[in-house]
């Protein structure tokens, strides 16, 4: 039932409001229909292909702010799907707030080969977004895998449960 779904979602993510959709593409369509207008700029860490398609369909600009190391297939890093905080901050500083309706952080970063994003990077991305008054949206298609990588690769999270890590992740989302 709807009420069991609501209870489960709130218990996992800590968020009381949600809109069920049958797939990620539909969710993107709903949210971008409400948030974007022609000419807007949507920064992110390598937008997934359907995400980029929904943004560009609305005559907006999907801007990649992924760390440069994500493109180096020979370099091994524990978190290679991260937002480049300096690139994001530069974009937000150089564009009017009304032209940037949101920032999209994809966890894990599918376009960069399913690379995870650290909790530190999620937190820093959220801090920058809040400083500029821009909502942070999480593309959460693979949130559980990302939480697992945080648990196994990031200092300070080995003793936390996946649920605790997920709850922390979503404290940074809008």
PLM regions: where:
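Conserved PLP-enzyme active-site core in the AAT-like
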Residues: 4-174
């Amino acid at each position: 039932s709807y009420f069991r779904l609501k209870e489960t979602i709130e218990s996992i993510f800590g968020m009381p409001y949600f809109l069920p959709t049958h797939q990620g593409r539909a969710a993107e369509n709903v949210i971008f229909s409400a948030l974007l207008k022609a000419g807007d700029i949507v920064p992110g860490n390598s937008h997934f292909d359907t995400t980029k398609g929904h943004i560009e369909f609305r005559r907006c600009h999907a801007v990649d702010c992924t760390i440069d190391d994500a493109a180096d297939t020979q370099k091994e890093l524990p978190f290679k799907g991260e937002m480049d905080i300096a690139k994001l901050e530069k974009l937000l500083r150089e564009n009017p707030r009304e032209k940037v309706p949101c920032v999209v952080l994809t966890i894990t970063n599918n376009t960069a080969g399913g690379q995870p994003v650290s909790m530190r990077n999620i937190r820093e991305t959220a801090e920058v977004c809040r400083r500029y008054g821009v909502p942070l949206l999480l593309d959460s298609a693979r949130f559980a895998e990302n939480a697992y990588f945080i648990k196994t690769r990031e200092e300070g999270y080995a003793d936390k449960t996946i649920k605790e890590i997920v709850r922390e992740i979503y404290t940074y989302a809008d």
